[in-house]
A protein has these predicted regions:
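Surface-exposed, interaction-prone regions used to assemble/regulate multi-protein complexes
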Residues: 1-128
Length: 128
């Protein structure tokens, strides 16, 4: 993995106290124009990673962001999958979720990284 990844705390500094004003399954757009995406940031050979946003509520102020681990390196019969959700909150209420997954490719010999991207900052969500 490359050293360019930042912590979730650094991502929060870019988005907390802003509002989600538009969204689709691939991105959230905040009131200041900031775009939040889920990126397939690294991989080798046939490994892959990704995620999509769902259940987004507009115009609520972001007060927190959490990454919830849903299982790491779970054997799938040919390699391993890792799962995590990115959950965005207004107070204690969920206002957006991205379900994310990473796969380590054919036979588990490779790797992939799924990252949350805000501006030029990337934060690892999950990896396999």
């Amino acid at each position: 993995m490359f050293a360019e990844y930042k912590t979730l705390e650094e991502v929060k500094k870019q988005i907390v106290f802003k509002k989600i004003v538009s969204w689709d399954k691939d991105k959230l757009i905040l009131d200041d124009g900031t775009v939040i995406t889920i990126e397939f940031s690294e991989q080798d050979c046939c490994a892959w990673a990704g995620g999509t946003f769902k259940d987004v509520k507009l115009d609520a102020v972001i007060t927190d962001v959490q990454i919830q681990d849903k299982g790491q390196c779970i054997y799938n019969g040919d390699g391993h999958d890792s799962y995590a959700d990115v959950v965005i909150y207004h107070n204690q209420n969920e206002i957006a979720k991205a379900e994310c997954e990473a796969n380590d490719g054919n036979g588990g010999y490779y790797y992939s990284v799924c990252a949350l991207r805000v501006k030029d900052i990337q934060c690892v969500i999950t990896e396999a």
